[in-house]
Amino acid sequence: MALERTLSIIKPDAVAKNVIGQIYARFEGAGLKIVAAKMIHLSRAEAEQFYAVHKERPFFKDLVDFMISGPVMVQALEGENAIAKNRDLMGATDPKKAEKGTIRADFADSIDANAVHGSDAAETAAVEVAFFFPGLNIYSR
């Protein structure tokens, strides 16, 4: 088992529903530590840069529009196999297909407004964590 860090974003739909604490409780209940966190309202440029990997995909504009529609809660999570653990907690991208008891099954409305983002691999996690928390703004505990 490997100690890993991953990025998690609680998206505008879940922030608006006031379920940040419930989602944090799930992270902590699964043994993940929140080692950095901040609430921000992404600019269009920030959202486009963060999701640049999807720039050529048909959903890119809608994704960016959604991500700038309200504040988001961004956190770096740390723990054993944090990337896979967080992805299991999130559930399938489409909340209709997400397993009961996952974050998306419980809090998401649609495949677009799907409550959370999580890094999908160690390489992307490193880039995504550095995007939001450059330098020494992460505190292992």
Curated annotation (Swiss-Prot):
Indicate which residues the UniProt annotation says bind ATP.
K11, F59, R87, T93, R104, N114
Summarize the protein's role: Major role in the synthesis of nucleoside triphosphates other than ATP. The ATP gamma phosphate is transferred to the NDP beta phosphate via a ping-pong mechanism, using a phosphorylated active-site intermediate.
For this entry, the protein name equals Nucleoside diphosphate kinase
Q: Identify a single GO molecular function assigned to this protein.
A: nucleoside diphosphate kinase activity
List of catalytic residues: H117 (pros-phosphohistidine intermediate)
Cofactor(s) annotated in UniProt: Mg(2+)
Instruction: Please list the reactions this protein catalyses.
Output: a 2'-deoxyribonucleoside 5'-diphosphate + ATP = a 2'-deoxyribonucleoside 5'-triphosphate + ADP; a ribonucleoside 5'-diphosphate + ATP = a ribonucleoside 5'-triphosphate + ADP
Q: E.C. number, please?
A: 2.7.4.6
Q: Which GO terms describe its biological process?
A: CTP biosynthetic process; GTP biosynthetic process; UTP biosynthetic process
For this protein, the record's InterPro entries field holds:
NDK-like_dom (IPR034907), NDK-like_dom_sf (IPR036850), Nucleoside_diP_kinase (IPR001564)
**Chief localization:** cytoplasm
